[in-house]
Structures are given as C-alpha cells and as structure tokens.
Amino acid sequence: MELSLVRLWNTCFPSFFYISTVLFLLTGGGVYSHSEYLIGLGSYDITGPAADVNMMGYANMEQVASGIHFRLRARTFIVSEPQGKRVVFVNLDACMASQIVKLKVIERLKARYGDLYTEQNVGISGIHTHAGPGGYLQYVVYIVTSLGFVRQSFDALVDGIENSIIQAHENLRPGSIFLNNGELLDAGVNRSPSAYLNNPSKERSKHKYNVDKEMTLLKFVDDQWGPVGSFNWFATHGTSMSRTNSLISGDNKGAASRFMEDWYEQNTAERSYSEEFISDEIPRRVSSLIENHQDSHHELLELASYFESQPGKPVTRISSSARRVRSALRKADKPGFVSAFCQTNCGDVSPNVLGAFCLDTGLPCDFNHSTCGGKNEMCYGRGPGYPDEFESTRIIGERQFKMALELFNKASEQLQGKVDYRHVYVDFSQLNVTLPKKDGKSEVVKTCPAAMGFAFAAGTTDGPGAFDFTQGDDKGNPFWRLVRNVLKTPDKKQIDCHYPKPILLDTGEMTKPYDWAPSILSLQVLRIGQLFILSVPGEFTTMAGRRLRYAVKTQLKNSGNKDLSGEIHVVIAGLANGYSQYVTTFEEYQVQRYEGASTLYGPHTLSGYIQEFKKLSKSLVLDMPVQPGPQPPDLLDKQLSFLTPVMMDTTPSGDSFGDVISDVPKNLSLKRGNGQVTVVFRSACPRNDLLTEGTFTLVERLEQKDKTWTPVYDDDDLCLRFKWSRHKKLSSRSQATVEWRIPESASPGVYRITHFGAAKKLFGSVHHFTGSSSAFVVT
C-alpha cells in the first residue's frame, strides 16, 4: 500500500508541480482572483529633440538640450468593463501634460476609434521632469524660454501618446488589478516649510509629516500572462537633475520606471517567477544574460586588437536598435512589462532631501525666504548624491523602485466594481465659489484671471531664479513694477482679487500675440472599482492635496452608494490634461513663497477645485450627467517659433560623419564597477532624426563564436551618456561624445562603442551614418 502511494506520488508530483506553477503565474504570485476587467498596457518613445531646444521646468534660458541621459516614454493603461465603459491613463516622462497636445491626441483617437476614446475618459499626466524638451504648450508664458513653439517637441509627444494608447488598446485582455500602498520616508522633503506651518495647527496635528509619504500602487495581472505592469503615485519633484543639466532625462521617476521594467524583464527571463519576485536588487540588465566566456585577460586583449575603429559610413535609416537591446529579454508572444511612476501632489515636495544650503558659506539657507545674505541665487537644495546630480537621480529613483517592488510583491486588495468617469471644463478666471462660514452660513467668493507674483521669479531651492527676487515677498519693488507695467498694468480689481500677492505678470489679461495663460481648465475623475483618480492640471502642495482628497472621499462615502461601502482610495494625478502652475491652501497663499506666487487664480483657487471635484464625484456615484463646460481654445495655428532650423551639417575635408575623433587607447582594459570609456565621433545635429524607438549610441559586446557584435547597452541606459556639441556656437560641424560608466553587472569580454546619426545636406536631404570605436576589454 505504501509503495503504491509512493508510485502514485512520483507519477503525479511533476504534473501537480507544473499545474501549481502555472496557477501561480496566472494569478500574479499566489493571489487567486476572478478577472473583473479587460486590461491593456502600452509604452512608446517621446524623447523628442536632443539638441538646441530649451528644457521645460526651470525656465532657465541657458538650459538647452545637448544629449541624452536616458530616453523618455509615454506609458499607458486601459481598463474596461467587458461590455461597458473604459478609462485610459497615460503617464508621460515630461514636465507636464499639455492642453493642446491632449486636444490633438483626442482628434487622432476619434479618427481611428470613433467615440471610444474622448477627452472625458482619457487622462494624461506628466512626471514633472525638468530635463525634457520644451515648447509643446500653447500658452505664451510657458514657451518664452524655448523661443516659442517647438513643433518637434509637440509631435514627439502627440505621436508617442497615440502609439502608447494604440498598443494598450491592442493588448486588451481579461485580467485583474490589485492595489497596495505604503510609506516611503526618504524620497522627499518640504521645500517651503514656513508656508506649510501657516496651515492651522489642528489640521497639521492630524499628519505625522509635512509631506505625503504614501505611495499607492496598481498591479496589473493578465489572466494568461501573469503580471504585465504597474503604475504608482508618489509625491516628489522631478528636480534631482539641476537647472544646469543639458542631457534629456526622466529624472528620478523615469529612472525608477527603467529600474522596475528592467528588473521584471530580466528576472522573469533568468529565474523562475516564484523564487525571484522577492528580490529588490537593481536589475543587472541584458549583459548579464550573454554567455560569459572565461578567457584569459591576455586572450581577450589579443582578440580586441583585431577590431580597430571603423570609419564613418552611410547606412539606411537606423532600425530600432534600442528595442533590439531590451527585446532580448522578452517573449515574442507577450508585450513588455510597463511600469510607470506617476506624479501626484508634489507642489512643495523636493527630492533634494539633504536640505537647502548656501553655495558660498555652506550654511543652511534662511528658513523663511530661502536666501543667502538676502539673495536667493546662492541657495540650492542638495540631493542624496550631492554634488553628483546623476547619483542623486539614481538614488531617489532607486528608493521609489524598491518601495514599488515591495508593494508589487505584496499587492492583494483586488479592485472590483464599476469603471466610470466624469470630465468638465471650468473657467477658473471667474469662478463663483461658495465657502462655509463659522456661523453656519456661507459666502460667495471669486477666483481671478491668472496672475503670477513677484516670488515666482525667485524660483525655489531646487532651482533659484535670478536678480533680486525673494520667496515670501508680498510687496514687490518699484523697479520690477515699472518693468511689469511695460507689458501689462493690472487694474485695482485684479490687484484686490489676488491680494496679498503682488502681481509681477498679469498673464490672465495678456493676449498679445495670443493668450499668455490658460483660463479654462480640465477637471476629471476616473473610477476603477474602489479607486478614484483625480486628474488636476497643476501642482498641488501637500496640504492642498490632502484637503482635496479628503473632500472627495467624504463626498463619496456620504453618497449612500452601496458599491462604496468598503474602503475607498482617492489619488491625485498631478500635472494632468494641461498645466496651470500651482495650487496652495488659502493659508499658504498668504505667505507668498514660490508656490503661493504661482497659484494663478488667487487665494480661493483650491476652494474652487474642491467645489468642482465634489460636483464631479457626486454626479459619478449618482450616475448623473454633467455639462461639458466651455471648450478651451485651440491655439495651434497661432503659434510662433523663433528656433532656428538646422541649415546643414558638415565635416572637415577628408573626414566623414561617424569617424572617430578620439578613440579608446590601444590595449585598453578596464574593470567593472569603476571604469569609464569615452569616445568622440564626427556627428550631426540630432534634430535631423530623433531616432524615435532607436538609439544614438550602443555599447556592443563581441560574440566570440561567430565574431558578431551584440548590443548590450543603449541611450536608454543610465550608465551610457550621449553628449552632443557644436564645434562653435553657429558652426555646421559637431561632435558626439559617448561616455560609458561600466557597471558592476557588465559581463567580462570584448566591447566597442557605436554611434548612429543623421546629417542634413545644404538643400535639405538627410542621410544616416554610423561609426564604431576600437575594441577594448572589460574584466
């Protein structure tokens, strides 16, 4: 009998193990569920022009793109009831969403899908990196430093968003969504604590920290494929990269996305799903999968000596080399894992967690005004990798990645219930807002046409402004009032409406050559079961965000809707569907630090948002329609651009595009983890071809069996930097400097650096080229 049982066990165990493993994979790590929805995810390159274009965020005229730290992407999820409504959420590695970009994306989606995707159920949010190309918003004040509208920046975003949504639509399949949240303590500090302290002490006492520490994560699990992605929301600014950086970068949130996606693809390829999903190591990347030949150092050097630098040569248009690198880890029948690190109420939250210090003395900046000796220009926040901004970006990104990974592995609360949405356009330049009074009565106040205060020009500790502006300035000074009046003098009604903000730029009343600031804003609620996403077109401060979430959550709980009897989750998607700068509390506004001075519509802006979102939430749970509101203007045909086009590219006589100017030394051998390779190539302006879904540079490793070169790192890797520069300011000659900081995870072997580009001839035709360095050894 015992022998029969043993035989039965030996026969059945392999099948039992196989079935158990399959069930584990299907349910996303041991979480058994019944799929509620159709889910689909997508991702597409939105990097844009990597040269000549001013970066969006710091408003620093001198911060002009000249290369790539790593690429930018649009990441999308679609959730649909099998026979019902659907919602779309797009997260952009961009400073913010743009009203005109969304309008044009919706036009394209309607042409392709009819009324399936509209401005009502599509939400688009930006991570707020300050290291992406600017010029893609339609209002004057946001495109002054980019020399007007930049068509390439705009097109890259519209194309990328559309393609990421198309991917997500085509990937729609039955699946489940799980939610988890937890505290991340060391990735953000309050950069305006004096303003936060002006909030009522009773309100502040309800919260342990002066910034939100909670990360909320969604885990998407396909019924057949298992986990296919994750999206999370956490508040910290995209300002780990400084105002002097000129390399396009997704900053800390973009880095976190890259870490999470590479981790998943690598670990599902290398090891069994169950044993590896508890790891929180930074991914080792593709190179770790290549066969590791244990050749002697001498043999590797001898092999490398056969491969000298390749002169530049013309090629057909570059195929998608970047996708070749990462696709090495993917299954042909399954799309890549998509992980987005989304922005929420980050208005007063800085990733420069060491605090703000004076450059000249090393002492902490003035608490109330963030100045050094009365001036703001010397006060800078320090990230955890100070003075290395790239290291700070990596560290803050890594901290978010590790938190997300922990939440991902433990996510067990399944989203269940309706998919729905509400959207409205609201004119915030003249909104009547009803406020409760202490005596139980109410009063009606108004928001104001947009205006920016003097402290706006002071900047923040993440990026100080110029001249003699200071934060906390509620008076202004005569000289800058005179300068202001040349543009537009605010009338008494506007001054009184914005009080105590001294108006520097009366943007809401400036209309030449077209509108300087928005008046009509997009407000949106997306519902997935017990999760409600509030899409707001601005940067809410910590306490402003808390008040909005609390008001909406209270409205939902008190609705009497039986579907909402359990736990309700409310998250704010910041910088979404447009941009209108900051939103502070009424009390923070009185202090007039940078955030208060940048609250466009006056002291009652937040109250206006709360009022309108309560209306939207009520209509959502009661299944009532809402009026669409006034349509925002389409100013695309009015845009002006003063960015000089690329006229032509040239090389010195006898040289070719792609030639190596500065090669690696002969017999170069470097150790992993502490070596760096630098190669300089004859190049051409990256604006000639953005190489979307491609790469300007590769690190390639020699496959010794067949003597072929395999791509292992590209310009979407943080260890590889592509830097472009002209010979002189207006020169038609240029060069590309490629720097590879060899990671500890790189496999020993023979390597080379390859550069791709596109050159423009005098009469407009563009031809592509490539060139490669000599080989070198990594041990």
UniProtKB/Swiss-Prot annotation:
Location of the protein in the cell: Secreted; Endoplasmic reticulum; Golgi apparatus
Record's catalysed reaction(s): an N-acylsphing-4-enine + H2O = sphing-4-enine + a fatty acid
Residue numbers annotated as active site: 350 (nucleophile)
Assigned keywords, A-Z: Endoplasmic reticulum, Glycoprotein, Golgi apparatus, Hydrolase, Lipid metabolism, Secreted, Signal, Sphingolipid metabolism
EC top class, as a word: hydrolase
The EC number(s) this enzyme carries: 3.5.1.23
Glycosylation sites: 368, 432, 667
Mutant phenotype after disruption: Increased accumulation of hydroxyceramides. Enhanced sensitivity to oxidative stress induced by methyl viologen. Increased sensitivity to C2-ceramide induced cell death.
Gene: NCER1
InterPro entries according to UniProt: Ceramidase_alk, NCDase_C_sf, NEUT/ALK_ceramidase_C, NEUT/ALK_ceramidase_N
GO cellular component: endoplasmic reticulum; extracellular region; Golgi apparatus; membrane; plant-type vacuole
Domain of life: Eukaryota
Its biological purpose: Hydrolyzes the sphingolipid ceramide into sphingosine and free fatty acid. Regulates sphingolipid homeostasis. Promotes oxidative stress resistance.
GO BP, one annotated term: ceramide catabolic process
A GO term, aspect molecular function: N-acylsphingosine amidohydrolase activity
Organism of origin: Arabidopsis thaliana (Mouse-ear cress)
Tissue specificity: Mostly expressed in stems, leaves, roots and siliques, and, to a lower extent, in flowers.
Protein name in the entry: Neutral ceramidase 1
Family the UniProt entry places it in: Belongs to the neutral ceramidase family.
PANTHER family in the record: CERAMIDASE, NEUTRAL CERAMIDASE
